[in-house]
A protein has these predicted regions:
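A conserved mid-protein helix/loop that constitutes part of the nucleotide-sugar donor-binding site
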Residues: 20, 228-247
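Short hydrophobic beta-strand element within catalytic cores of glycosyltransferases
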Residues: 318-321
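Glycosyltransferase donor-sugar binding loop
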Residues: 229, 233, 254-268
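A short, active-site helix/loop in glycosyltransferases that binds the activated sugar's phosphate group
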Residues: 162-199, 207-209
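Acceptor-binding helix/loop patch of EC 2.4 sugar-transfer enzymes
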Residues: 67-82, 133-171
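N-terminal subdomain of nucleotide-sugar transferases
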Residues: 1-58, 246-250
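Nucleotide-activated donor-binding/catalytic signature segment of Leloir-type glycosyltransferases, i.e.
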Residues: 266-283
Length: 387
């Protein structure tokens, strides 16, 4: 099968877990003898092509007023101009059509489409190619993709959100198949009226198993190393992590570490340092896991999936988090996940991680996820329709 996968970013560009999930999915499909082309954005001015781990990748310039992934602060008017164009980016539609007509895919699989905009669905339809879309964030509801604003989760049924997503919802009628990366995000889009003509399902993200020895054992029994990894932001709960660190700052036996991108204009960086958090910077997941015993993720937004939760469990860690979005589903599948409303840090650091059985690991293997997407592709191509 010839599959064109569209995602905002692809290796080496990365801002979160979606890029990792899309890359693992693309590589698994390529190993299963599909011809896969990934279409993604680049900050460069020219198109370029690479082959990464057996997957062909086409990088195209973003046709908008700035590159939004460089961490640089933009003015209010720059942001307004960018987002207005991103509601339906005609230039990116033309770019997508050119790639589709050259590659001639059997199916276009869209994922995160900020930058491309929903115009890529129109491009695929104009070329007579069927579309499957996977929601990995809340971009279709709100331009910040998090449905989290000024410290609060936004109501998808509010007048403001319904107005913001009206055009995107209308364009979603063009999509033939829809997948959410958790039951939560799948139901949220379905209940809001997105993808009325599509077959709906949910497929979890790929999370490869890791070799892990004795995850419940502490390197220093007298010091409990508490870790946070991810974006240093309020929706990820990093402010609450800092508050927790401040609370334990003068108590012996606790050390707090945080891994993520450090930007000096982020007020939470100073808050972290003042609270006694050791900032590790942007390091690999493996390096982070070697330096912590318990992972604390006080997420406030509705995590579409919760990739870091699964990765932490697979590295033999106990996770303390909040019951938000897809994380609640993961707790029903995986051991060693505890919720902050039910247990304290003092208690959770005493828990040893339970071993993982093969059946648990099988839920997230690249081959299994690729098989599930193959079935979703076949359903779309065979014109099956389901509610």
């Amino acid at each position: 099968m010839r599959i064109l996968i569209i995602n905002t970013l692809y290796h080496p560009y990365k801002v979160g877990g979606a890029e990792v999930s899309v890359q693992l999915m693309a590589e698994a499909l390529a190993r299963r003898q599909h011809q896969v082309l990934v279409l993604c954005l680049t900050p460069e001015k020219q198109c370029s092509n690479k082959v990464i781990n057996g997957v062909a990748v086409c990088y195209v310039p973003l046709a908008n007023c700035y590159w939004p992934f460089d961490g640089e602060k933009k003015s209010f008017f720059q942001k307004v101009r960018w987002h207005l164009k991103d509601y339906y980016n005609v230039d990116m539609r033309s770019t997508a059509m050119e790639v589709i007509r050259t590659f001639l895919p059997d199916l276009v699989h869209t994922n995160n489409i900020a930058g491309f905009s929903v115009s890529v669905w129109s491009a695929a339809k104009a070329c007579g190619v069927k579309i499957l879309h996977t929601s990995r964030d809340y971009y279709l509801f709100h331009h910040n993709a998090a449905l989290f604003h000024r410290g609060q989760n936004q109501d998808p049924e509010s007048i403001r959100i319904r107005l913001l997503c009206w055009l995107k919802k209308r364009c979603s009628r063009l999509v033939d198949g829809y997948v959410g990366i958790s039951r939560f995000i799948f139901e949220l889009h379905r209940k809001a009226g997105f993808f009325p003509n599509a077959r709906h399902s949910f497929i979890y993200n790929t999370v490869p198993a890791v070799e892990c020895a004795g995850g419940g054992c502490l390197v220093k029994e007298d010091v409990r190393r508490i870790g946070f990894i991810g974006k240093f932001s309020a929706e990820k709960g990093f402010d609450d992590f800092c508050t927790l660190a401040r609370h334990y700052r003068n108590r012996s036996g606790y050390a707090f570490y945080a891994a993520g991108r450090i930007t000096q204009d982020n007020p939470l960086i100073k808050e972290a340092r003042d609270s006694g958090v050791t900032l590790l910077g942007f390091i690999s997941l493996e390096d982070f896991m070697r330096q912590v015993d318990v992972v604390v993720l006080p997420v406030k937004w509705h995590e579409p999936f919760g990739r870091v939760v699964v990765e932490s469990i697979f590295h033999g860690k106990v996770v303390l988090t909040n019951r938000m979005g897809g994380v609640a589903e993961l707790a029903a599948l995986l051991p060693n996940i505890y919720f902050m409303e039910e247990i304290s840090v003092d208690e959770v650091v005493k828990r040893l991680a339970e071993p993982l059985c093969p059946d648990i690991l099988a839920h997230f293997t690249p081959d299994r996820i690729a098989q599930e997407y193959e079935q979703a592709y076949h359903n779309v191509l065979n014109d099956r329709f389901g509610a």
